[in-house]
Amino acid sequence: MNDLAFLSGLLSELKLAVPWGHIAAKAWGSLKGAPVLCLHGWLDNANSFDRLIPLLPQDFYYVAMDFGGHGLSSHYSPGLPYYHQDFVNEIRRVAAALKWNRFSLMGHSFGGAVGGMFSCVFPEMVDKLLLLDSVPLVLESSEVENVLTYRRRAMEHILQLEASNKPSNVVSPEEMLQGLLKNNSQVGEECGKLLLQRGTTQVATGLVLNRDRRIAWPELGFDFISRELFKKALQKLQARVLHVKASQGFTSVRKETKGNKDTIHFMIDTLQMILKERYQFVEVPGNHYVHMNDPHQVAKIISTFLLSDGAPAPGLPTTA
């Protein structure tokens, strides 16, 4: 399908000032509509939502932001790492810049985990939380033994980058696309091109990646929490939650094991137990990027949820 058809309704590109530069974002819909902040996945960018948002009700105001160091947003100041709480803080800064006191969050993958933490830390600010093949918080589970290794690896990576002071690699558009598809097999070719439109800059001899090379290991970008803290955090949550799981999605990306399965089941059971009718779970066929590869698959589900009030949306199951 022609990408221009998907981009219909785009209102504007935004640049929101932050102490280290700016947060870039793009907006669709009605300025007078209820606001929805859209959060992309790890190493992706705001173009992650280009195919989905035009299929949603256009009387909302959708803003898809680039996290710091991603897309067209400024990189963090030299010497500083990117921690989970910093991305959570970016949501608060964007809300302040847009003068939003209450809004909904829609996050894919890593964006859902950042949005979930924000929704627990600032519960009064979030009306609805939509998780697209994501989890609201990340449990330590089998990763707990590796956390220190992850932190060391990430810190050493930053120090090596600073010491080498090498310029970014310049490659051809085709090489860039094939590199993306090799490292992320669940992104289709057309969607890969869409992400690279915002994720790269054209120079005389090819393309360079826009993202900050300090952002390398997703484990440093997550806050791993205990099951006890998971329960406590959910008790603070005021938002209604729509949890859309892809049948071949997040757990496949994370190399599904018995431990991971148990963790996912614990999360879903706990969400149902604590949030009750405020939690709705839907599984759809597709992979981790189903919202890009097959946006019609999830658009109706999301639209129904956004348009619904306090009661569970008709036609959306509330159990896994």
Regions found by a protein language model. Name each.
Residues 26-75:
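Conserved HGGG/HGGXW glycine-rich cap/lid loop of the alpha/beta-hydrolase fold
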Residues 132-169:
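A catalytic-pocket lid/entrance helix-loop region that shapes and gates access to the active site
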Residues 286-299:
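Catalytic histidine-centered segment of alpha/beta-hydrolase-like enzymes
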Residues 55, 61, 100-146:
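Conserved hydrolase catalytic core segment
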Residues 6-8, 14-19, 64-106, 300:
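Active-site loop/oxyanion-hole signature of alpha/beta-hydrolase fold enzymes
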Residues 199-275, 280-282:
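Conserved serine/cysteine hydrolase catalytic core
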Residues 1-38, 57-61, 100-101, 136, ...:
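Alpha/beta-hydrolase fold catalytic core
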Residues 163-224:
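Conserved alpha/beta-hydrolase catalytic His-Asp/Glu region
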